[in-house]
Amino acid sequence: PGTYRPYDLGEEMGVWVNNSDGTTPAVGKAWPPGDSVFPDYTNPRTVEWWTQMCLEFKDVLDYDGIWIDMNEPSSFLRGQYPGCAVNDINNPPYVPSISDRSLAQKTLCPDSKTYLGAHYNTHSLFGWSQTAATF
């Protein structure tokens, strides 16, 4: 076991968004500067994990609300380690006119796996699914 309970329990429960292999957690860079994994709030196990973490925190600090601002899978990398594979889902024939013409710009690779499928199809559900789990 490590020294950070939310990570350790999340790893044990398998709650992270995974790389395209579907088993290895996607690791990106985020605040504070350093490696980050991303909870897959579409996974029922993640809802259990999130509930447990909120309850444990409430034992420490009796809060009456949670501000879940910036609840998107944000990464300072183009995708995550070791980078996005060269394939059609990561490099579709049409890409909107965005900063570097990459769907992985400041987020996870589109072929990353969530409980509901490819990140390409679930990216916009990330914040919504965290909100649903928090409510």
Model-derived segments and spans:
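Catalytic-domain carbohydrate-binding cleft regions of carbohydrate-active enzymes
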Residues: 1-135
